[in-house]
Amino acid sequence: MTTAHRPQLEARNGAKGALVPTGTEHARLLPGHTELKARKPKNKTTSQIQTSSDAGSVDDSTSAGTNIGTGSATLGPSQVQKMIQPLEVEDKKDIKLVKKEDDSVSWGKTAFSRRKKVVKPEKFTNDTVRSQKHKEFLNRFVK
C-alpha cells in the first residue's frame, strides 16, 4: 500500500515537532472495545427460583379451567368445533374468489395469444443422409 492510501495524521509542512492538529481522527487511533461484557448467571439462586415459580403458578391458575370474568367452565371440544366450522367455510369462499381473480388474468387474453404462430423452417442437420434436401433429391432423381 502506498502513502496515498493512508490518512494524514500530521501536518504536511515540516511542523512535526510543533504538533499542529489536522482535524482528522483516524479510526485506527480510537479504542476498539470500550465496554466490558458481563457474564450472565448460570445458576439461579433459591430466591429467584421461588419468584419464578410463584409467577408461573399464578398464570397456571388463571388458565386452568374457568374464565375469571364469567365464572363459566372452558369450552369443550365439540363446542370449539362448532365455533370453528363457520370460519373454515369463510376461508374456503375466500380461496375460491382468489382463484376466480387469477383465472381472469390469464395469459390467454394477452397480446401473446393473438400473434399468429409462424411455422419455422427445419433446422440444419449435420447428417446429409437425413437432411430434407437429400430426401427431396432422392425422390426426384433416384428411383
Curated annotation (Swiss-Prot):
Residues 44-82 have a biased composition (Polar residues). GO terms for cellular component: catalytic step 2 spliceosome; nucleus; Prp19 complex; U2-type spliceosomal complex. GO terms for molecular function: RNA binding. Residues 1-83 are annotated as: Disordered. GO terms for biological process: mRNA cis splicing, via spliceosome; mRNA splicing, via spliceosome. Keywords: mRNA processing, mRNA splicing, Nucleus, Spliceosome. The keyword Nucleus applies. Pfam families: Cwf_Cwc_15 (PF04889). Signal peptide: none annotated. Its main location: nucleus. It is found in: Nucleus. Belongs to the CWC15 family. Associated with the spliceosome. Involved in pre-mRNA splicing. This is Pre-mRNA-splicing factor CWC15. The gene is CWC15.
